[in-house]
């Protein structure tokens, strides 16, 4: 398929300031060529990240994250003011002169969700032993998405494979453990049953990472998608999935289940990957996962095994200390990987144990990034302080895109 490639390599120093080379790269023009893969054949992001000199973490901190941080490590981190790790998680730019965290700006304050649709959905979810990423990740849009309006239905986002993740990303409040409980074999059916009872026409199925499973949970996700389609064929399914550690077979398994949208988040710019995400995640690995999903979908359509080309989607958080040039590069990299839709939102610290906010981005700047995304050729760019990867404003637009693709059979 035709994708966009930059005239340059994908190498940045980790945790370093933006170099002159990086600035030049953001301004390079892009050429269109036909490719199969736009990245190296190796699936490990460590090769990309270690070939060049980087700012090394302290030995103590490297040891602490060797197997991914646990909840207890986060607690110790927040209570140890003398540790070098504490300095790593905060900086003078993330606090005011009094030493307190940045004050939440007015544009990020939302009403506390309660009663009505929120209470009803919570009760139904608990009765079926299901979990939502809205609750686990403390999303600020839970009330808006779960409450139906005059002209819109509530949008549901279900988190499957349990509520405990094997990874410990330092922005996420989902529980972590190297040995989470086994998968519930009845979950795909229970999930489909719950969704069939809701007045929704767009459902997001997301999950925790399950590195303890051979396929990363891909077959479980695929089974869930198929069960939903059996019970409610008209519904549009978006799957927001892990990177499966770069395993192409797992990606293919999910794509073959025919979700309309295949989403995977790169989360942040390249230089902050090791700061923000678990060490098993990686910038190139995430980009390659998205590209692989689109390529597989393209082959299924070409062979007549699928009726439409999957929409691919990713998300970026701002306010973690990223540079503007780096955000521009990340958006260009997503486009060249064939990503159709992107969401850009403000990072908000979920608890004191997690990464502090370096900057609250003004809404005008999010408008700027929305224009940049549209100029780069994304089918849809949702950009705003409260926008999250499953924000419903984008979902209705994506639904329109999918309907068009199905009608045209492309």
UniProtKB/Swiss-Prot annotation:
<keyword id="KW-0949">S-adenosyl-L-methionine</keyword>
<dbReference type="Pfam" id="PF16881">
    <property type="entry name" value="LIAS_N"/>
</dbReference>
<feature type="binding site">
    <location>
        <position position="165"/>
    </location>
    <ligand>
        <name>[4Fe-4S] cluster 2</name>
    </ligand>
</feature>
<dbReference type="InterPro" id="IPR003698">
    <property type="entry name" value="Lipoyl_synth"/>
</dbReference>
<dbReference type="InterPro" id="IPR006638">
    <property type="entry name" value="Elp3/MiaA/NifB-like_rSAM"/>
</dbReference>
<dbReference type="Pfam" id="PF04055">
    <property type="entry name" value="Radical_SAM"/>
</dbReference>
<keyword id="KW-0479">Metal-binding</keyword>
<feature type="domain" description="Radical SAM core">
    <location>
        <begin position="148"/>
        <end position="379"/>
    </location>
</feature>
<feature type="binding site">
    <location>
        <position position="139"/>
    </location>
    <ligand>
        <name>[4Fe-4S] cluster 1</name>
    </ligand>
</feature>
<dbReference type="GO" id="GO:0046872">
    <property type="term" value="F:metal ion binding"/>
</dbReference>
<keyword id="KW-0411">Iron-sulfur</keyword>
<feature type="binding site">
    <location>
        <position position="172"/>
    </location>
    <ligand>
        <name>[4Fe-4S] cluster 2</name>
    </ligand>
</feature>
<dbReference type="InterPro" id="IPR031691">
    <property type="entry name" value="LIAS_N"/>
</dbReference>
<protein>
    <recommendedName>
        <fullName>Lipoyl synthase, mitochondrial</fullName>
        <ecNumber>2.8.1.8</ecNumber>
    </recommendedName>
</protein>
<feature type="binding site">
    <location>
        <position position="169"/>
    </location>
    <ligand>
        <name>[4Fe-4S] cluster 2</name>
    </ligand>
</feature>
<keyword id="KW-0004">4Fe-4S</keyword>
<comment type="similarity">
    <text>Belongs to the radical SAM superfamily. Lipoyl synthase family.</text>
</comment>
<dbReference type="InterPro" id="IPR013785">
    <property type="entry name" value="Aldolase_TIM"/>
</dbReference>
<feature type="binding site">
    <location>
        <position position="134"/>
    </location>
    <ligand>
        <name>[4Fe-4S] cluster 1</name>
    </ligand>
</feature>
<feature type="binding site">
    <location>
        <position position="145"/>
    </location>
    <ligand>
        <name>[4Fe-4S] cluster 1</name>
    </ligand>
</feature>
<keyword id="KW-0408">Iron</keyword>
<dbReference type="GO" id="GO:0051539">
    <property type="term" value="F:4 iron, 4 sulfur cluster binding"/>
</dbReference>
<dbReference type="GO" id="GO:0005739">
    <property type="term" value="C:mitochondrion"/>
</dbReference>
<feature type="binding site">
    <location>
        <position position="390"/>
    </location>
    <ligand>
        <name>[4Fe-4S] cluster 1</name>
    </ligand>
</feature>
<keyword id="KW-0496">Mitochondrion</keyword>
<keyword id="KW-0808">Transferase</keyword>
<dbReference type="GO" id="GO:0016992">
    <property type="term" value="F:lipoate synthase activity"/>
</dbReference>
<dbReference type="InterPro" id="IPR007197">
    <property type="entry name" value="rSAM"/>
</dbReference>
<comment type="pathway">
    <text>Protein modification; protein lipoylation via endogenous pathway; protein N(6)-(lipoyl)lysine from octanoyl-[acyl-carrier-protein]: step 2/2.</text>
</comment>
């Amino acid at each position: 398929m035709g994708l966009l490639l930059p005239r340059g390599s994908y190498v940045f120093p980790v945790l370093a300031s933006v170099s002159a080379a990086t600035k030049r790269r953001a301004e390079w023009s892009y050429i269109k060529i036909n490719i199969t893969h736009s990245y190296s054949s190796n699936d490990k992001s460590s090769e990309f990240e270690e070939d060049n000199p980087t700012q090394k973490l302290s030995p103590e901190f490297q040891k602490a994250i060797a197997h991914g941080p646990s909840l207890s490590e986060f607690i110790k981190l927040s209570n140890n003011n003398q540790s070098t790790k504490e300095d790593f998680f905060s900086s003078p730019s993330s606090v005011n002169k009094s030493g307190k965290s940045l004050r939440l700006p007015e544009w990020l304050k939302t009403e506390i969700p309660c009663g009505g649709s929120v209470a009803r959905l919570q009760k139904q979810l608990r009765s079926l032993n299901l979990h939502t990423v809205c609750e686990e990740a403390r999303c600020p849009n839970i009330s808006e998405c779960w409450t139906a309006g005059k002209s819109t239905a509530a949008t549901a986002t279900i988190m499957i494979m349990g509520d405990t993740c094997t990874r410990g990303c330092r922005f996420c409040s989902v529980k972590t453990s190297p040995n989470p409980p086994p998968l519930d074999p009845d979950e795909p059916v229970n999930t489909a049953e719950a969704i069939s009872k809701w007045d929704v026409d767009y459902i997001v199925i997301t999950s925790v990472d399950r590195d303890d499973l051979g396929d990363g949970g891909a077959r479980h996700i695929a089974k869930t998608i198929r069960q939903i389609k059996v019970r409610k064929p008209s519904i549009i399914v978006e799957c927001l999935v892990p990177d499966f550690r770069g395993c192409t077979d797992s990606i293919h398994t999910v794509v073959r289940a025919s979700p309309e949208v295949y989403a995977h988040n790169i989360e942040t710019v390249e230089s902050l990957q090791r700061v923000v995400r678990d060490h098993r995640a990686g910038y190139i690995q995430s980009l390659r996962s998205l590209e692989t999903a689109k390529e597989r979908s393209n082959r299924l359509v070409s062979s007549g095994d699928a009726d439409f080309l999957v929409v691919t989607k990713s998300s970026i958080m701002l306010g973690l200390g990223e540079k503007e040039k780096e955000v521009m590069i990340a958006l260009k990299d997503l486009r060249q990987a064939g990503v159709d839709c992107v969401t850009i939102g403000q990072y908000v610290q979920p608890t004191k144990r997690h990464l502090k906010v370096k900057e609250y981005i003004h809404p005008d700047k999010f408008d700027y990034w929305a224009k940049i995304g549209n100029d780069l050729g994304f089918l849809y760019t949702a950009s705003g302080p409260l926008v999250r990867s499953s924000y419903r404003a984008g979902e209705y637009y994506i639904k329109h895109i999918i309907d068009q693709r199905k009608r045209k059979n492309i």
